[in-house]
Amino acid sequence: MSLTRLNIEAFRNIQSAQLIPAPGINLIYGQNGSGKTSILEAIYFLGMGRSFRSHLSQRVINNDDDKLTLFATLNLARGDSKIGLRRFRSGETEVRIDGEKVKRLSTLAETLPIQVITPESFSLLFEGPKSRRQFIDWGAFHADPQFYGAWTNVRRVLKQRNQLLRNGSAYSNIQFWDQEFVRYAEQVTEIRNHYVDSLNELLKGIIGEFLPSVDVKVSFTRGWDSKTDFAELLENQYSRDLATGHTVSGPHKADLRLRVGTLPAQDALSRGQLKLLVCALRIAQGKLLKQQIDKHSIYLVDDLPSELDAQHRQLLLKQLTDTGAQVFVTAIDPAAIVDSLHTPPSRMFHVEQGRVTVIE
């Protein structure tokens, strides 16, 4: 899978741009503030319906416009597919895939799987369990069609249960919701656990390439003691949950733990090593997606030279090339990327003040 055409209208400082990306490595270079990262952000927005740089989607709309428009043609195994998205300043979003209106943003994510490696993505190991759950759930969502529905139900039931707790409801009023919660929680946990097991098989070899002298152990924690019956736990913890006003244990507390010996990876490794570990996780996740559903991710790699030294840039770019996936990578100096590749980039784009030029 690859993008063969990308149109961007009124997205940050890009008033209008048309790109014809190539399979393989697409290098986008330009000075800071030129708009090169905005191209990556636009691709991400098209696949996720949101930005990876701002929680307020209205901020990505060009100041002179009331809406942004993104359009792409995807080359898929079954033929070409067209995706269009409009986001209005009012917050309304309009999405079409092959001319048909789409109501769920999850359909975008399913159509256009995206992996991001940016300076911010290295916070995967520092920001707490939420970002690591999102990492697991990205893979579980793509790997198992049952996951999205089960996780949606977990969130729905959890919201209802927490509301009852805040209202001080007796356990007899919560018991029905606990039966639902247990059913969906166990389904979500089984899918997550299976996904992490599959990821681990690939990850060992990739971590060995990036960090050959480090033994990293990766494990999944479900959000409650696996030796404890979840239904019994919820009943036994009712008083505690009532006191806090929320559900203390459950799949919403799951985590991906990475350890070196007895220490968490973030305490045992240097900042440079942690960056390589996150790169290994992203590479493994993309490779597993290809194995499981025969679909490539699209990789967005921002400001690579500032994050990794020349040796590790070369290693990451080799790993990305070996996946066979389409890659968009940005840099201020194109030589920092070109010199790290065994073959020239498939295509190069120069960005200046929001204007994009293809370099022949």
Curated annotation (Swiss-Prot):
InterPro entries assigned to the protein according to its UniProt record, in alphabetical order: DNA-binding_RecF (IPR001238), DNA-binding_RecF_CS (IPR018078), P-loop_NTPase (IPR027417), RecF/RecN/SMC_N (IPR003395), RecF_2 (IPR042174)
Entry similarity comment: Belongs to the RecF family.
GO cellular component, one term: cytoplasm
NCBIfam families per record: recf
Role description: The RecF protein is involved in DNA metabolism; it is required for DNA replication and normal SOS inducibility. RecF binds preferentially to single-stranded, linear DNA. It also seems to bind ATP.
PANTHER family the UniProt entry points to: DNA REPLICATION AND REPAIR PROTEIN RECF (PTHR32182:SF0)
Localization per record: Cytoplasm
Residues of the signal peptide: none
Binding site for ATP: 30-37
SUPFAM superfamilies referenced in this protein's UniProt entry, alphabetically: P-loop containing nucleoside triphosphate hydrolases
Keywords: ATP-binding, Cytoplasm, DNA damage, DNA repair, DNA replication, DNA-binding, Nucleotide-binding, SOS response
Name of the protein in question: DNA replication and repair protein RecF
GO biological process, one term: SOS response
Keyword DNA repair: yes
UniProt GO MF annotations: ATP binding; single-stranded DNA binding
Pfam families hit by this protein: SMC_N
Claim: DNA repair is one of the keywords in the record: yes
